[in-house]
Each structure stands twice: as C-alpha cells, then as structure tokens.
Amino acid sequence: MFLSLFVAATMVQVVQFDELREDPHNTRTLLQSYETERGPILVNGEPIAYSTPVDTEYKYQRVYEHGELYANLTGYFTHTQGATGMESAMNAELSGQSDAQFFEGLTALFTGNKPAGAAVELTIDPDVQQKAYDALGDVQGSVVAMDPRTGQVIAMVSKPSYDPNELVVPSTQEVLDKYTELLEDDSQPLFNRAIGGNLQHPGSSFKVVVATAALENGLIKADTPLPNPPKYTLPGTSSVVYNPVHGQKCGDGETTNLKIALQYSCNIPFADLAIQLGADKIRAQAEKFGFNKPLEIPLDVTPSVYPTEAMDQAQVGLTGFGQFDVRVSPLQMAMVSAAIENGGVLMKPQLVNQVVSADLNQLQGPQVSEYGRVMSEETAKTMNELLLYSVSNGVAGSARIDGIDVGGKTGTAENGPDEPHTLWFTGYAASGNTHVAVAVMVEKGGGVDSASQDVLAATIGQQVLKAVLEQ
C-alpha cells in the first residue's frame, strides 16, 4: 500500500510535473502566473493582449486590445475560469515556464530580477483581420485566410464574438455572471467557429475533394462525358437528387463533364461520381487534406469528418455533394484550396510567427513545414483550371477580381427541413509573390433571401482576397 502511494506521488511530482506546471487551470500555477508579468500576445509587433499591474492579490490583470476582433484567437486568462485560446495553448511561454525559458528564470532567481513571460507574436495580418471581420458584418460565421506557400494563417475571424476584458475584471461574481451569460447565449460566442464548435455540412464546396479523388484515382478526366439526367434517384431509395435548379440538366447537352459540373455546381454528377468511387477512396483523399485527423496550430482544431462507419450507396451519393455526415471547419476548407494553389502540396497551418523572451532572445521562429502531398502536380493543375473557370464563368462569379486569376467553389449546405442553409466559399488567388487561400462560412443563410444566398459567401471571400492582394 505504502509502495503504491509512493509510486503514485512520485509520478505526480516527477513525470507529470511539466504537465501540471503548464496547465492554466491548476490553481497553484494560476496564482504563480499572476505573480509574474505575463508576456504579451502580439500582432505585427503590437500587443493585442498584455498585463498591467493592479493592487490586488493577483498583482497583474490582462488587457485585451480590440477584444472582439481577436477574442477567438487570444481567448482569455482569468482567475476563475482558467484560460482558453492562445492564452492556454501558449501558457508555458507566456508565463515564463517553458523549457526554453528555464535558464532565464534561474538567472532571475539569482539576480533578484523579476521573472517575466515571453512575447508570442501571431502570424495574423491586422489589416486583413479587420477587413475579414468587417466583411462578415452581422452574420454568424467565420473567415480563414492563409498563405498556401507557408501555411501561416493571415486572418481568422469568428462571429459572434465577445469582449474578453469583461472576463478579467477583479470581481469574481462579475466574471461568473458574464461567463454564464456567454455560455447560455444561443449564438455561442465562445466557440471559435474557424476551427471548432459545431462543424457544418460543407455542401457543394466538398465537390472539390470529390473531384480531386476522381482525378487522382483515374476514374475520369476533366472532359470525360458523364450522364446528364434532370433528376437522379439514389440507389435503393425513393430519394431524388436534383441539380441546383430542380428538373434541369447540368448544362444543355445529353452528357456533361467535370468542368461543367463544377461551373454550375451540379449535384447529380457528383452523387454518381461518389458512388462510383466508393467511400474508401473519397475518405482516403479527404484524409490527405486533413479530415479525420487531429491538428494543433497550436490551438486545438476539431477534426473535420468524412464518415468512417459503413454507408450504403445512397449515403455515399449524398456525401458527393457534402451532405449526409460530412462535417467541416472553415480552416479545413481553406486547407483544401491552399493545397491546390500550392501545386498539390499542403503546408501545415500555423498561428505563431515567433516567441521572444523578456530579454529579447528569440525562443522560436516561424514553424514552416509540409503537412504532405495531397495530390499529384498534374491533378493540382487540372483542379486549378477547373476552379478558375468556376469563378470566371460559373456560380462562384461573385469572387471575381479584375485583373486577378481567382479560383474557387461555393457551397449551399442543407441542414434539415425548415432549417436555414449554411453558405460556403473556398478559394484562392495570387498576385506577384503574394498568395492567399480563403474559406468563408456563413450560418443560417446569412439572414438573407435565397437569391442573395448564392453570392453572399463568395462576395465576402472576394473582399478578403482583395485585402491580401492589394497590400
């Protein structure tokens, strides 16, 4: 009995020491963190979160500049609710307790200097972040923009947002009241919709993944003739699939092809392609893009989902245009476009540009790395041509920018009878040495009529692409 207790205690003290030390929910760690001047979180060298001295037992209080603009990124650091967002993910560095800061802390101990946390600079571009936030307006949704060549996230917006300053006031009761109010808010402002929360059906934006799978597996080419009926009954059911305009074919011909199907966002060809491919091949392609896999950027990203359980042919057909149990985050759809723009190679998304200690030593630089090759160069070239055509001559036309080649795909996802649609745009553009991929997700149909829904997400995407390219 004594031996068991000794071993357990030793495990906690030695093996789990780092984990406990870095856990922002650990009460002792929390109090120690407030004794130290916590490092700032920076965007383009300017603090968006920093500590200021206060005359309380906690010594310091966090201040969040432009709180609602960056809340989904910074999160909060409070004495009652712990920490979220980058405040949690980079807690060890911000509190001066990371392994890389050990000797700095040791030096402070001997010199009598006050220890201080490191500064964490994000990859976010403040101008693009602001323009993405403004472009979303009053709708519930999210925007993600990233550099396809490096994986660095340029903008990450989630709405509705909240002001984290209201969660760091000295009054415990005020903090609890505000936290409860946010938690019970039906619009779920505490969720970072860009990377998690309630994942959404991607709708027709998922056709990009299915088209890639069809090309990679040699099932078809861009101009391979495909059946073109005005309606399609899913195998083994009485359920009928229509193209966006009920009862109309995909183009004027007796047959259609992948180029036309993406141009007009036709559902029938993609339901048929999905059934021909089968779930395993679609899933394998989706997982190359990052579906069904954990990811830290260093914020924890909720894995997007292509179903792993057995499906019948009808269900597989529905996944062909992003329905049934396919669920995605905006970051995931930005990754899909980024891989195509980057010649088939997906770079790992990253939010941290650098970490700098209180004595100005760089503890960490940009972490640029490949996530993996998602498709062949040939497939990427074909997909690029198809998506450029979808914007220049198709339903994604609201993303057009004069003088710039823009590729992309819209999506209008169904959420059940009488439920408003989820709207999507994923795309990319480049000008000179500037490259950008973007994803836009708008919940509840954006609160607009069905005719306006077709262009809303693409219009937002176009504004964000322009914001990056015009700098």
Regions found by a protein language model. Name each.
Residues 154-204, 209-446, 453:
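Beta-lactam-recognizing serine transpeptidase/beta-lactamase-like catalytic domain environment
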Residues 1-175, 199, 224, 280-287, ...:
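Periplasmic/cell-envelope proteins involved in peptidoglycan metabolism and beta-lactam response
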